Amino acid sequence: MDKVNFPYRSDSHLPFLHVVHDSGSWEKHGLDVNYDYEISSEDSHKNVANGTVEFVGGNHLSPYIRRPAGDKWVYLGQTVSLLNHRLVVRADSGINKVSDLKGKKVATKGKHPGLNTWLFIKQAGLLNECHVEKAKGSKFHWEAVRDGEADAAFVTPPADILSKRAGLKVIEVPFLPMVWFTTVSSGLPFVEKHAEIVDRMLRGICEGIAYFKTHRAESIKIIKEKYKAEGDLDDETATHLYEDLKKILQGKPYATIPAIANVYEISIEQDRAAEKTDPMALWDFHYLRRIDDSGFIDNLYRT
């Protein structure tokens, strides 16, 4: 059994990662994966480069920014290519659709999630029509809406249900093509030296996705018992989180072109240095392609 580190950049990845781990999907491929801890963007680059971390779950913007300076980051697989967000507002706000955000304050969280909101609003033609601001303190950004500190926020499950229970109105909006959530990331020197571990890591991810999609009750149980980042989940919230994630998880974890285009755009918004990196330069799907061509992934779904 080979030990590898696979820290996440956001604890929102954990509902999926807990299922991959607890289903034995990595273990089946001879890997003992240390996945249940967070890593900063800075430490991701430093620790992958010095070999103390083999893989990182995520890190979606800084690699585009750092590549012109010689960074060797590489993306090997992408579990989702859609951001499954909803708009939440106060019930008496008069907001019923995205265009109603004109003149309103929209609360966000974090750098990448905040830029997702920025891009969605930009694509809706509202960039100079509303104010996007990170929620203050440690509260969830939907709580800023509840408390009257903002007019709206974009949230992902289970926060939509939690918002509704707090009296907010949940508005369905189109999902945004985006590279986010669990991406299998590493450094090119490690990947070239350990192709066999890369192969097993990706097989474990594919196996975990298949288990998630085909073992509903078991996956919901794991999520309910182990995912605590947004408080204890009951049956309704755990089931909703599962069902929504199941819809967007990709059986074959290739990033879509619209998702890559959008993450590239927000990386440039964060730092213009990213313009010097080609949007496709960080992606290497040939390890996944070999697994796919072998029939391994298709066989996971054959009964």
Task: Locate predicted features.
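Secondary-structure end/capping motifs
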Residues: H194-E275
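Short, glycine-/small- and polar/acidic-enriched structural segments
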Residues: M1-E133, S138, D151-V155, V170-M178
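Predominant activation on well-ordered alpha-helical scaffold segments within soluble catalytic domains
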Residues: H18, Y64, W118, I161-K164, ...
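Conserved C-terminal helix/tail region of periplasmic/extracytoplasmic solute-binding proteins
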Residues: Y264, I268-T303
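Small-molecule pocket liners
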Residues: S81-L87, V179-V184, L188-P189, V263
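Pocket-lining segment of extracytoplasmic ligand-binding domains
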Residues: L61, F140-A229
